[in-house]
Amino acid sequence: MPIVSDKQKEATSLIVEQLVQSGIKLVASLPDDWIAPLIDAVDKDDRFKHVPVNREESAIGLCSGAFFGGIPSLALMGASGLTTCIYAITKINYSYHIPLFIFATLRGVIGDPRPHHISNGLYLTKLLDSISLPFLLVEERKTIERIPAAFKHCQAMNRPEVVIFSEAVLLGDA
């Protein structure tokens, strides 16, 4: 794992504490370099059951099943992974009114030098809007504190909700 700065550790700790405040018990994750410190923190924290999965749809299925077991959960993935899950989300979670809380990264925006993520920057939020999937865009540190409210909204609606993090927030620079 790359070296993690003190600012990044602090941002990660703040996010983890918001998960605890939300009552999250299970986290299903897929690797993404922007959220690697968060995945590592959740994995090492006894307050969570962390399940690494190999496909985004597996995280969707696991977290949806956890709902029926009364276990508050989170699917943690990159932006590309989220875009591949749209069918599963609309088929399972929308059809059967299953809440699903998702964290994703905001890739392909100004400042992201990786050309293979440009489509995420262009289309991710528009795609979510097109299927009426609410999201909280976290581009400033103070917005992290809204995570429990987003989780509560997701549960109240019995529908998915996404929290999308900018790289600056995850690095502790915003």
Segments from the language model and where they lie:
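Thiamine diphosphate
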Residues: M1-A174
